[in-house]
Amino acid sequence: MNYNKKIIHIDMDCFYASIEIRNNPSLKGKPVAVGGKANQRGVLTTCNYEARKFGLHSAMSTSQALKRCPNLILLPVNMSLYKAVSEQIHCIFRRYTDIIEPISLDEAYLDVTACKQHSGSATWIAQAIRQDIWQELQLTSSAGIAPLKFLAKIASDQNKPNGQFVICPEEVADFVKTLPLKKISGVGKVAQEKLAQLGFITCGDIQQADQALIYQQFGKFGQRLWDFCHGIDPREVEPHRPRKSLAVENTLLSDLDTLTEAEDVVKSHYQTLLFRLQRNWGDKPLSDLKKIGIKLKFDDFTQTTLERTTDGIAEHHFLQLLQQIWQRRKGRKIRLIGLNVHFPEEKITKQLNLWE
């Protein structure tokens, strides 16, 4: 694997909440969250670190958040404001490179391999970008610098908030070897438990494993996991890459076999889907979204999908799809449920995060 790329992953710190606090300094030092109202089954879009001390996090239901933190200051989502600030941040990015891959309004990959500023040092470039953002917008950000995309993303979380972390090419092998598998994107709680049962805790453990076993146990994801654990990630930073859909899927903590249980999962996924639509679809009307889909993966690792064009994306539309696709179960247990919504092509104006 060639490690000659210089990739920076920039992640704004508590982006929406930080903008609100910047615009209203009286909120500083208080637990603040941005999200929907509790009586409307809302969820938190983001919250600041004061709120996180109470165990609050993005995508948590607002009602649960208020139980944990009764003094929480809950602010409505102001997407037009966040988009405007995001564009200001991207203007700063473009001073250093045109190779920018936005992940969401508050997160992006930058390829600065060809950048000559600051003697071509990706570390100094990242520091300069973060300094520009702070001086001009009074917002903090964190950065990860590495020759591979997946490592840059992991690195950006190492010194949050308002910090950065560098993984040099010559450090990749040692860093990856000791990297906990739970740090890798896609290794959720269920996958982590399964890996632990097989004796895999770090990437180094996977390096000593049989490749066929990893592929057999984890399918397509196992191929990516194997590559990452061996310091392989050929993905380029892709500017202006339009995505056509947004989805939510999770492997369940335990397999289920009743429609009632599946309906509860769909209802939970639907709230997460709305949360992600807030971040990625913005303030455009949800009525523009007509095509939805559902996916079931069974305990024999086969899967089936069903898509429909509807008159909206209300919760009951997904529940209807579930009832229709349920007939395909044929006695098998369900290990994964996924929901997705397709974006009209003429509405796609920027990259959207798929299966985020």
Swiss-Prot record:
It comes from the Bacteria. Keywords: Cytoplasm, DNA damage, DNA repair, DNA replication, DNA-binding, DNA-directed DNA polymerase, Magnesium, Metal-binding, Mutator protein, Nucleotidyltransferase, Transferase. Its main location: cytoplasm. Pfam families: IMS (PF00817), IMS_C (PF11799), IMS_HHH_1 (PF21999). It is found in: Cytoplasm. One of its GO terms (biological process) is error-prone translesion synthesis. Its cofactor is Mg(2+). One of its GO terms (cellular component) is cytosol. The record marks Y16 as: Substrate discrimination. Its EC number is 2.7.7.7. The active site is at E107. Residues 7-188 form the UmuC domain. Binds 2 magnesium ions per subunit. One of its GO terms (molecular function) is magnesium ion binding. Mg(2+) binds at D11, D106. It catalyses: DNA(n) + a 2'-deoxyribonucleoside 5'-triphosphate = DNA(n+1) + diphosphate. PROSITE patterns: UMUC. The keyword Metal-binding applies. Poorly processive, error-prone DNA polymerase involved in untargeted mutagenesis. Copies undamaged DNA at stalled replication forks, which arise in vivo from mismatched or misaligned primer ends. These misaligned primers can be extended by PolIV. Exhibits no 3'-5' exonuclease (proofreading) activity. May be involved in translesional synthesis, in conjunction with the beta clamp from PolIII. NCBIfam families: PRK02406.1. Monomer. Belongs to the DNA polymerase type-Y family. This is DNA polymerase IV. It comes from Glaesserella parasuis serovar 5 (strain SH0165) (Haemophilus parasuis).
